[in-house]
Each structure stands twice: as structure tokens, then as C-alpha cells.
Amino acid sequence: MPFFKAKEQAPAPAVDFDHLPRHIAIIMDGNGRWAQKRGLPRTAGHAAGAENFRTIATYCKDIGLEYLTVYAFSTENWKRPAEEVGAIMGLLKKYLLEAISRMERDRVKMEFFGDLSPLPQELQDLCRRTREISKGYDGCQVNVCLNYGG
């Protein structure tokens, strides 16, 4: 019989639902570096980060959080290679389309902050559409910050 137990996952801490914060903000940073450290393309890190954010957003909605803000793409991010920027824009499009398909059920409201004008026109239109569809919903408000900074 081994002396040490196999490494076990620590149990998730209990959530005190009587003392939840009203607002949580997340800065999407380090996903490309995370991928590079694992020998993966930076775009794989962005995809993993987007999926992790979706998991977090779902949890926040489920526990009744009022506001969730994600700083997703800053003005500095335009300096990245065009392929990487394109991949990030593609991920944003993918997740917004998925969000739209679930909005009525989830009652999530989405707002967008930052200068959206440099984004591809299709993405600008999708942001406006998402905002319009969700404007009357009363669930968690997800604020997406795009092309912010200065």
C-alpha cells in the first residue's frame, strides 16, 4: 500500500449565497502565453480562454450574479498578427451567436462597451443585434468590453 495518496482535486469552496458580490469583472489576459507554454498555437489559448469564460458566465448566471464584465479585446490587441486578431474576432462571433440562441431561455442581458467602429462590420452588427434582443431581459447582465483603452 503506498504511503502517499494520489493527488486529489481539492473540493470547491462553499458559496455563501447570502453574501454574493453584485459585480465580477474578468480581464482576458494570458491565454496566448498559456498556449505557447504548452507548445500550442496562441489561437488555441484564446479558444480555451473563451470556453473557460463561457463556463464562468454560465455559473454566474446560475448563482444569480447581477453583473459580469469581461475585458475581451483592448486597443493594444490590434498590434497582434492579423491571423491572431482574426481568430479572436471569429471566437467572439461564435460565442455571440451561441448566446443569442439561448438568450430568451436564460434571460441574460448583454451590453457592449468601447469603440466598436474598428471591428468588422459583421461583428458590429452582431453586437447591436445581441444588445437589442436582450435589452428587456432581467437576468445577469454581461458587459463585454471591446476595443477599450487609450
Q: Model segments located where?
A:
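Flexible, compositionally biased loop and terminal segments
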Residues: 1-150
